């Protein structure tokens, strides 16, 4: 990462974008465990899609969801978001507020939008809204990425 005052994830993503060469850019967090065939599903869904579809959002889940009360609460929130809210927004044709991981986007669309907003801590949701505003579409990917839920009790 080059030196500078702004030290955010979106700035790091923009920096890495300059080194990318593929047509599809994927964003996964270091602790993520995507399904083994997730990249194949991404390639297939993009290959069969309308050209206006430029972004796919995978489902997130936790591999330690049943560890304690707190992890179950996190799992319940993710289940509501990824199985109810996002599919509902997609069916209604609304903009999808993207998540910061398990997200895949056509490089050309990202370049046209000038990348991520380096000053925005909700750069992922912002990107989904900016894509929608320009007439481009996001869709849900039928694939799961697991991560670890915070397991520390409240007290």
Regions from the PLM with identified roles:
Residues 28-30:
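Active-site acidic Asp-centered loop
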Residues 25:
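Short aromatic/hydrophobic "clamp" motif used to bind/position activated sugar donors
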Residues 119, 128-146:
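Catalytic donor-sugar/metal-binding loop of nucleotide-sugar-dependent glycosyltransferases
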Residues 1-22, 36-121, 132, 153-154:
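Long helical/loop segments within the catalytic core of UDP-sugar-dependent glycosyltransferases
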